[in-house]
Amino acid sequence: MSNAVGKIAQVIGAVVDVTFTDNLPAILNALETTNGGNRLVLEVAQHLGENTVRTIAMDTTEGLTRGQEVRDTGNAITVPVGEGTLGRIINVIGEPVDEAGPVKHEARREIHQEAPSFVEQSTEAQMLVTGIKVVDLLAPYARGGKIGLFGGAGVGKTVLIQELINNIAKAHGGYSVFAGVGERTREGNDLYHEMIESGVNKDPNENNGDTTGSKCALVFGQMNEPPGARARVALTGLTVAEHFRDKGQDVLFFVDNIFRFTQAGSEVSALLGRIPSAVGYQPTLSTDMGALQERITTTTKGSITSVQAIYVPADDLTDPAPATSFAHLDATTVLNRAISEKGIYPAVDPLDSTSRILEPRVVGQEHYDTARQVQEILQRYKSLQDIIAILGMDELSEEDKLVVARARKIERFLSQPFFVAEVFTGTPGVLVDIKDTIKGFKGLCNGDYDHLPEAAFYMVGTIEDAVAKAERLAKEAA
């Protein structure tokens, strides 16, 4: 540990300049000082001249004074890792924020790590079944892959992530890490309590701080926190996940929201004196994103499957922030406002969402053929919509009318009630097996259910549920 002591020279918002007479700390080193009785961590970002470093604060800087002493810790920010973090909420510097005492840990690990080398990485493709029909059928997730959930404000990214945590964490039984990056504190609080209620985590306050048996570690740096915390909290979460992976676990790593990581970087970038690039983002956008994403990978020891919510500013997928993240993903799930306006949830766009593993070699011929058939029908319906809008349904040929009828049923059958939304909708959630999903959509494409009304396919699980709903609707109408 270096014991070099410096003094604060100036404070500009989240950026603090510190002067050292000798032993200048290295870039990315953590410096410590106190502010109002609390420990404040500063991370070195730049060297200015011979004896000054420019740092980014991990907490608020109100109350700091010039001339105040700052100590160099001699290494990067370290956080507790190991099974003691499960069931607990920690912040960017690894301190507990759930008021349940100190975090028990096996070791502390630096948040800046090298990405695994090519030799250590594993490349086999395997499907991760989520129980969500539209995802499993049209844009399946790879075990150990990176998945992006793209969507504008309020189309259901966080609900979809919560459903995935619920479905996969329960079915998969492994450990999960949830990094809340610059999102609403209320949602983080809800998630924490929902996890305790659903049995994924144990309540530390009821067991004298003990969370043995918990499955998910939570790492939060929320909207109200300074940009330094939001720019680093994803790395803190990833460090916790990497430790489990290196112990041979298959880990699920959820990030909500990766855009806020970029946004925080752009906030401090200008304060650090960098010239902004396109749309005002930081010039190091691709480098920052690459440094995070390249560490999220599957090695020969274990795997990290990551699901990342990606906010799309003004619903524009060509914005540099979402566009940069596209390059790193194995599967993209695009949420569309037009679909959510129809009341179809999850509002996943079946034509825009993609997956690298949707090929017969990985998912099997029947699954592949059914998915392509569904997309073909939906694509034809999309191309007919202009004609329908101008001339009406009557001008279509009989064949096209049939395509439209099937497409509308498929659209509704892609909806599904969620477990985490039960409290709002009153409809019990369903988890649909991939075999049932393929069977249902194959029958729809082949016209086996042309006689059933559209309404029967809305918000049901399997095709048997749809048939039962049709019978119920017929009885009610009679």
From Swiss-Prot:
Record keywords: ATP synthesis, ATP-binding, Cell inner membrane, Cell membrane, CF(1), Hydrogen ion transport, Ion transport, Membrane, Nucleotide-binding, Translocase, Transport
Binding site for ATP: G151, G152, A153, G154, V155, G156, K157, T158
Catalytic activity: ATP + H2O + 4 H(+)(in) = ADP + phosphate + 5 H(+)(out)
Transmembrane residue ranges: none
GO cellular component labels: plasma membrane; proton-transporting ATP synthase complex
Compartment(s): Cell inner membrane
GO molecular function, one term: proton-transporting ATP synthase activity, rotational mechanism
SMART domains noted in UniProt: AAA (SM00382)
Membrane topology: Peripheral membrane protein
Pfam families, sorted: ATP-synt_ab, ATP-synt_ab_N, ATP-synt_VA_C
Superkingdom: Bacteria
InterPro entries with a match to the protein in the record: AAA+_ATPase (IPR003593), ATP-synt_VA_C (IPR055190), ATP_synth_F1_bsu (IPR005722), ATPase_a/bsu_AS (IPR020003), ATPase_alpha/beta_chains (IPR050053), ATPase_F1/V1/A1_a/bsu_N (IPR004100), ATPase_F1/V1/A1_a/bsu_N_sf (IPR036121), ATPase_F1/V1/A1_a/bsu_nucl-bd (IPR000194)
EC number: 7.1.2.2
Family annotation (CDD domains): ATP-synt_F1_beta_C, ATP-synt_F1_beta_N, F1-ATPase_beta_CD
Function as written in the Swiss-Prot or TrEMBL entry: Produces ATP from ADP in the presence of a proton gradient across the membrane. The catalytic sites are hosted primarily by the beta subunits.
Record-stated family: Belongs to the ATPase alpha/beta chains family.
Subunit structure of this chain's protein: F-type ATPases have 2 components, CF(1) - the catalytic core - and CF(0) - the membrane proton channel. CF(1) has five subunits: alpha(3), beta(3), gamma(1), delta(1), epsilon(1). CF(0) has three main subunits: a(1), b(2) and c(9-12). The alpha and beta chains form an alternating ring which encloses part of the gamma chain. CF(1) is attached to CF(0) by a central stalk formed by the gamma and epsilon chains, while a peripheral stalk is formed by the delta and b chains.
Protein name: ATP synthase subunit beta
